[in-house]
Amino acid sequence: NALEVNVAEPVPVSAPTHDTPVPPDVSHLTTEDDQPVENSFQDKQCDILTEALRVSWSEGRPFLSASDVAIFPVAKDEAAIVPDVLLSLGVEPPGPSNAKEFRSYYIWNFGKPPEIVFEIVSNKSGGEDTTKLERYAQIRVPYYVIYDPDAQLSSRPLRIFQLTGLSYVEKVDRLFPDIGLGLTTWFGEFDGFREQWLRWV
């Protein structure tokens, strides 16, 4: 059932830049909206994707894996976007997480966008394959993953997109060779829930 699309050559993992401008004032930005996670499955799925890397990462390079953290683009007039999970390689938190200027993923602090972002579909109105697809392309995220376990948006529960030029092309495989990771689905029990989970390989 693979789509017949042309898959572009892997996008090189971007390195942090060292000539970024002076960080703007973030005191007026909303970094937390106290909105609850949409459902328990989504909460557990985010845990699988973030915690697995923290306990098993063997690459020897720093990384940041987080859930429900806002990404703020460099352009001051662009609104933040909050993926369910993000993974950024070769970076470390630039400061204490309790400070407002370090609570979110400000691209001007890290020098680059995350390598991968995930959206976990819980309803048909989240815009995961429309507005969010466009936003992540605009801020130059190399890989965008939509996990739709109930097939609410598509007959394919897992779709992976790779940035090609200014837009995304859907991948026909689940591997990220330039990052050294891949994805698979697994049916089993995690923390009391028996579900079809998305996990790293």
Regions found by a protein language model. Name each.
Residues 59-71:
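A short acidic/basic microdomain associated with nuclease active sites
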Residues 142:
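Short acidic/polar active-site loop segments enriched in Thr and Asp
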Residues 64-66, 145-148:
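A structural signal for short, well-ordered beta-strand segments and their strand-loop junctions
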Residues 1-38, 43, 52-55, 71-77, ...:
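C-terminal interaction segment
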